[in-house]
């Protein structure tokens, strides 16, 4: 009989369970803070792997984008169809300080606006704010019946659509180029630009459901920590004590 290994004896026991490590035990929880332009500052929590070796938790968090309903940020259900994108720019302790990154409409809201017997007019413009953020704004509008109109349809002529689109572009350019990103955000929340377009185009053709349906951030300037802290209602300046001047008294030695 040949001397060798007994394969049956060398085999390990079947069914031995591997030790499972809970992946959440290696993670930390951070709070996400919205800018002070919104009423509700606490957006929620986010998880990240703890700092270990060369992998820093702060680096993993920076640049994360969160999509939040504007209804939650403003505590108002009327804004439920709009979504705001917030980008993490800085970490302070266990807080993620975010900045505005974009705005969008929910799909169901956009679908509900499109109806028969009316013209849909869209316009977009690329504009730079005073604090050097390059944005692209998309506007949408629909024609409506004139007072005492009997005709069922409200189709605008091509020349009227061109004139309305020109007005929309001019107003968006003017409103966005004359303010900072945070000031533009305060205009977008109550839909100031949409009402301005509706008022300006009244003489061409009456409009309804005029909205800035999308705001896209194309390019951001060099990161400024001071500007971000001001946006979150915090300050970079530390309160330092004043130097107290005292009269110099020469020490007299009693014994040499």
UniProtKB/Swiss-Prot annotation:
It is found in: Cytoplasm. GO terms for cellular component: cytosolic small ribosomal subunit. The keyword Chloroplast does not apply. GO terms for molecular function: structural constituent of ribosome. The modification N-acetylalanine is found at residue 2. Pfam families: Ribosomal_S3Ae. Residues 1-18 have a biased composition (Basic residues). Residues 1-20 are annotated as: Disordered. The keyword Secreted does not apply. GO terms for biological process: translation. Keywords: Acetylation, Cytoplasm, Ribonucleoprotein, Ribosomal protein. Belongs to the eukaryotic ribosomal protein eS1 family. HAMAP family: Ribosomal_eS1_euk. Component of the small ribosomal subunit. Mature ribosomes consist of a small (40S) and a large (60S) subunit. The 40S subunit contains about 33 different proteins and 1 molecule of RNA (18S). The 60S subunit contains about 49 different proteins and 3 molecules of RNA (25S, 5.8S and 5S). This is Small ribosomal subunit protein eS1. It comes from Aspergillus oryzae (strain ATCC 42149 / RIB 40) (Yellow koji mold). The gene is rps1.
């Amino acid at each position: 009989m040949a001397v060798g290994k007994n394969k049956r004896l060398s085999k390990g026991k079947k069914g031995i369970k591997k030790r499972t490590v809970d992946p959440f035990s290696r993670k930390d929880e951070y709070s996400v803070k919205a800018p002070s332009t919104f009423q509700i500052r606490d957006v929620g929590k986010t998880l990240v792997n703890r700092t270990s070796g060369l992998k820093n938790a702060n680096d993993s968090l920076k640049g994360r984008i969160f999509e939040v309903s504007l209804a939650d940020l403003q505590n108002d259900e009327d804004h439920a169809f709009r979504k705001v994108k917030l980008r993490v720019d800085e970490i302070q302790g266990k807080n993620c300080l975010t900045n505005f990154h974009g705005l969008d409409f929910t799909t169901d809201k956009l679908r509900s606006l499109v109806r028969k017997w009316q013209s849909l007019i869209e316009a977009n413009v690329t504009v730079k704010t005073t604090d050097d953020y390059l944005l692209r704004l998309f506007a949408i509008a629909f024609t409506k019946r004139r007072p005492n109109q009997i005709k069922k349809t409200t189709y605008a002529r091509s020349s009227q659509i061109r004139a309305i689109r020109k007005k929309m572009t001019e107003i968006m350019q003017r409103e966005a180029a004359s303010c900072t990103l945070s000031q533009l955000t305060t205009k977008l929340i109550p839909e100031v630009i949409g009402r301005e377009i509706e008022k300006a185009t009244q003489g061409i053709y009456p409009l309804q459901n005029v909205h800035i349906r999308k705001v896209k951030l194309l390019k951001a300037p060099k990161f400024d920590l001071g500007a971000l802290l001001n946006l979150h209602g915090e300050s970079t300046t530390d309160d330092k004590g004043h130097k107290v001047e005292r009269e110099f008294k020469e020490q007299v030695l009693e014994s040499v």
